[in-house]
Amino acid sequence: MGKTRDLFKKIRDTKGTFHAKMGSIKDRNGMDLTETEDIKKRWQEYTEELYKKDLHDRDNHDDVITNLEPYILECEVKWALESITTNKASGGDGIPVELFRILKDDAVKGLHSICQQVWKTQQWPQDWKKSVFIPIPKKGNAKECSNYRTIAVISHASKVMLKILQARLQQYTNRELPDVQGGFRKGRGTRDQIANILWIIKKAREFQKNIYFCFMDYANTFDCVDHNKLWKILKRMEISNHLTCLLRNLHEG
């Protein structure tokens, strides 16, 4: 892997860096926007609409949860930090994960202190709640914002806390997820499902049987999650109020 990365670096150094030109984009009325500032405003408008918060039917959760889950251990912070992939884009704070690796134990102690404070108060640092959105074009008209996939880049420090939180939630989610689910499962993947489909197709051909598949592609699936319903589902799953409050305060800005 390291040699491959060095190879691509030498190729980039030889041919130079490609800078994509920001082309025109359409506004909500279908008019072309060509000025950089207008394009930026349109993207801001689009992402705000895409990720707008549902402010209705809120639960009363202003109080800090005092019945806490077991405190975060330094070994959890170390594990989370080591599990973050290197050579990845930094979030809004611009701090690369490689810096934390260089600082070693000092980074672990510092992050542990901050994570412990978040754990107690359920209040996240504002920088940890910020995301940098990068639009990746999909198929279709490149002038339509809806034909882009928005990738959210968050700070590596925030990822440490999120990985710890995810690990704590895993014990609850594992008992709820069906065996047939391949995506977002440890030790499984959609490749396993593809292999199963290929095996089914092979057997259908072998025995000359008809076979039918239905593929559903939901538009903006992850962008359209109703958070109010999500909190209710977590409650039905008997996930602790403490963990739910941490997630809720992260999403409510």
Can you describe what each PLM-predicted range is?
Residues 24-25, 87-95, 133, 143-153, ...:
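Conserved catalytic palm subdomain of right-hand nucleotidyl-transferase polymerases, strongest
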Residues 55-56, 123, 169, 173, ...:
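Proline-centered turn/helix-capping motifs that create local helix->coil transitions or kinks
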Residues 65, 94-103, 181-188, 215-221:
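Conserved short loop/turn motifs at secondary-structure junctions
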